[in-house]
């Protein structure tokens, strides 16, 4: 090698190292009493705080995180939205990539900080997300985003200001909260024979209150037409805003089990007890970044479907699930459990205190959530501004409804990737039909007609190390296998199983890769291929500008009409990846499936430190 060539190599290595640095983090997981909404219960703390610390890295950093389990129960940590390319052993999913971290033990996760954007991390052991292990992740990008910001403003100062604002955003981790731990909550359902999904609070950055505005107020806050379309005449919510637990429209069936609503403890469904505590306050400075502020929002909810709005402030939605999208302006946006949004807000209003309204917008419960956005220097305690949402999440005017983001409406959920990124047209190489719904009990959920994914499935023999462990067994119905380099279509059908024709929506999350939603329609999927469906229903498909995400809603009709969705992805990341509903009750009830992507190129050289003993 010549002296000049060696010099070039040294320079190249220098700049490569300048981009990629090693970042080491330590997370200590503990269990103790706390009262984030003013009412005490035991919960998970991470490094002594709740929610877990926000982690900020640069794209392509080498990340090394040591997790110490100082609880008396198992834990794992999943890095939601990170692709884990070439590091499937660090995905944090028990039974697929690792064994659970047992009490007193530790586990070291190593991976690249990729892709850039807004992500989050959370526990993935049983229903323990309910107990509070979740935090935001922000991976700052290397690339130029001028083309993204120029869709919002052509002003050069604005473009630079938005880039700076996005580099240093505000973080909102939004979660739902119950007075019961995850184990207690699940036991209520199995003891009573009823699916219970009534909550106490919506928290923002671990802060909130318990509101008891009265039953009549809550009844008036029901979404227009909800009772008429979905429930028997005269159905009323409780003083917590919850529908009666034993309604057939809620529980489905009939199931061959005994329903015991009398075994639901007091204050679960009704018997609201208010508590004054504190709501999160986000202080914003209109003198910085030309008056622009970016907010990264994590829907760390376990049941609720939340709606985000800030009084008197429009926002530009520019990122979903860590993927940049062509920005669109809204006044409110519905987020499903597991999703992440990034929004850009212009601070162009009178300095003051503006309420951030973040209610549950799903059909499960009328429940309000709040925080405050306060202009820096504002000394008044009085709130100001025009509300876009009511307590229960209803638009306050027809104009608000027209300018809101609804994931179940394709005209508003047309958020195409920036820069353009579309899937292969025509047929995929593989197609898999998954029929979702309930089987046997109100709390049992399946993704393939009948099989329930156990929460401890393959915990002792993770599929990364034993990919053929389920072959020739009934458990192989819980596993899909794909080939490396193939295009795959996942066809999801909802509301067709016996006893589950009025199924609630599901929030479907795939580990290891994002998917394009290329098709979506009402009815029963009875086509021999996606290609046939495209020919017969071309208006229900979009292969030119489909959205690209890792979490999608399966739309539903409250009246019971069936729906299907088609998700396409390219297999280039061999490993065992969980595909599941991000509603914790549904996953606990069995709504998951293991996808072994690239079985013909399975990881052979697993680092020694990750090898099983």
Curated annotation (Swiss-Prot):
- On whether Kinase is a keyword of this UniProt record, the answer is no
Q: Where would I find glycosylation on this chain?
A: 74, 256, 279, 444, 468, 484, 526
Q: Which cofactor does it need?
A: Cu cation
Q: Where does Cu cation 3 bind?
A: 124, 511, 580
Compartments, as annotated in UniProt: Cell surface
Detail which positions bind Cu cation 4. 506, 509, 581, 586
Q: What is its EC number?
A: 1.10.3.-
- One GO CC term on file: cell surface
Q: Which SUPFAM superfamilies match?
A: Cupredoxins
Using the UniProt record, name the top-level EC class of this enzyme in a single word: oxidoreductase
Q: Which domain of life is it from?
A: Eukaryota
MF-aspect GO terms: copper ion binding; oxidoreductase activity
The UniProt annotation places Cu cation 1 binding at: 78, 509
Report residues binding Cu cation 2: 80, 122, 582
Query: What sequence ranges are listed for the domain Plastocyanin-like?
Result: 29-142, 171-359, 468-598
Annotated keywords: Copper, Glycoprotein, Metal-binding, Oxidoreductase, Repeat, Signal
Sequence similarity: Belongs to the multicopper oxidase family.
Q: What does this protein do?
A: Laccase; part of the Pks1 gene cluster that mediates the biosynthesis of an anthraquinone derivative pigment that contributes to conidial pigmentation that provides protection from UV radiation, heat and cold stress. The polyketide synthase Pks1 produces 1-acetyl-2,4,6,8-tetrahydroxy-9,10-anthraquinone though condensation of acetyl-CoA with malonyl-CoA. The dehydratase EthD and the laccase Mlac1 further convert the anthraquinone derivative into the final conidial pigment.
Q: What is this protein called?
A: Laccase 1
């Amino acid at each position: 090698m010549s002296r000049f060539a060696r010099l070039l190599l040294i320079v190249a290595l220098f700049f490569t190292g300048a981009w990629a640095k090693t970042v080491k983090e330590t997370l200590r997981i503990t269990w103790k009493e706390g009262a984030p909404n003013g009412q005490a219960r035991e919960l998970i703390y991470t490094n002594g705080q709740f929610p877990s610390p926000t982690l900020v890295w640069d794209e392509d950093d080498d990340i090394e995180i040591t997790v110490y389990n100082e609880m008396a129960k198992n834990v794992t940590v999943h890095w939601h939205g990170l692709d884990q390319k070439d590091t499937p052993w660090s995905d944090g999913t028990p039974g697929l990539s690792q064994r659970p971290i047992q009490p007193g033990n530790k586990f070291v996760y190593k991976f690249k900080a990729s892709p850039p954007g807004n992500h989050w991390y959370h526990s993935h052991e049983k229903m323990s997300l309910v107990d509070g292990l979740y935090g935001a992740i922000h991976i700052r990008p290397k690339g130029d985003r001028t083309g993204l910001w120029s869709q919002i403003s052509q002003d050069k100062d604005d473009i630079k200001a938005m880039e700076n604002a996005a580099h240093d955003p505000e973080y909102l981790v939004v979660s739902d909260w119950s007075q019961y731990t995850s184990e207690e909550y699940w036991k209520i359902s199995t003891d009573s024979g009823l699916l219970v999904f009534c909550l106490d609070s919506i928290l923002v950055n671990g802060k909130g209150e318990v509101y008891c505005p009265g039953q009549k107020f809550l009844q008036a806050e029901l979404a227009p037409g909800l009772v008429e379309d979905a429930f028997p005449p005269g159905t009323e919510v409780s003083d917590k805003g919850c529908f009666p637990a034993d309604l057939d429209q809620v529980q489905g069936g009939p199931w061959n089990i005994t329903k015991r609503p009398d075994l639901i403890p007091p204050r679960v469904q009704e018997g609201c007890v208010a508590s004054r505590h504190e709501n999160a306050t986000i202080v914003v400075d209109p003198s910085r970044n030309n008056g622009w502020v970016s907010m990264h929002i994590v829907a760390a909810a376990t049941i609720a479907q939340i709606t985000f709005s800030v009084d008197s402030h429009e926002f530009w939605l520019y990122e979903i699930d860590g993927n940049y999208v062509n920005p669109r302006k809204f006044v409110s946006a519905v987020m499903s459990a597991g999703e992440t949004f990034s929004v850009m807000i212009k601070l162009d209003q009178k300095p003051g205190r503006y309420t951030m309204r973040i209610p549950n917008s799903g059909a499960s419960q009328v429940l309000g959530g709040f925080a405050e956005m306060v202009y820096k220097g504002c000394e008044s305690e009085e709130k100001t501004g025009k509300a876009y949402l009511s307590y229960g999440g209803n638009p306050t005017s027809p104009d608000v409804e027209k300018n809101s983001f609804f994931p179940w409406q394709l005209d508003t959920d047309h958020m195409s990737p920036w820069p353009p990124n579309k899937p292969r047209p025509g047929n995929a190489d593989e197609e898999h039909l998954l029929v979702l719904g309930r089987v046997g009990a109100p709390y049992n959920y399946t993704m393939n007609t009948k099989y329930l994914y156990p929460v401890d499935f393959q915990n002792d023999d993770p599929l990364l190390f034993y990919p053929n462990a389920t072959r020739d067994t009934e458990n192989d119905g819980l596993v899909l296998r794909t080939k490396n380099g193939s295009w795959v279509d996942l066809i999801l059908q909802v509301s067709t199983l016996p006893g589950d024709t009025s199924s609630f929506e599901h929030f479907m999350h795939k580990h290891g890769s994002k998917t394009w939603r290329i098709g979506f329609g009402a009815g029963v999927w009875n086509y021999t291929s996606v290609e046939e469906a495209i020919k017969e229903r071309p208006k229900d498909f979009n292969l030119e500008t489909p959205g690209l995400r890792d979490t999608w809603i399966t739309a539903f009709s409250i009246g019971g009409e069936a729906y299907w969705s088609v998700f396409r992805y390219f297999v280039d990341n061999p490993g065992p990846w969980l595909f599941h509903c991000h509603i914790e009750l549904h996953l606990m009830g069995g709504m998951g499936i293991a996808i072994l992507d690239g079985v013909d190129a399975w990881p052979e050289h697993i680092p020694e430190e990750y090898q099983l003993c």
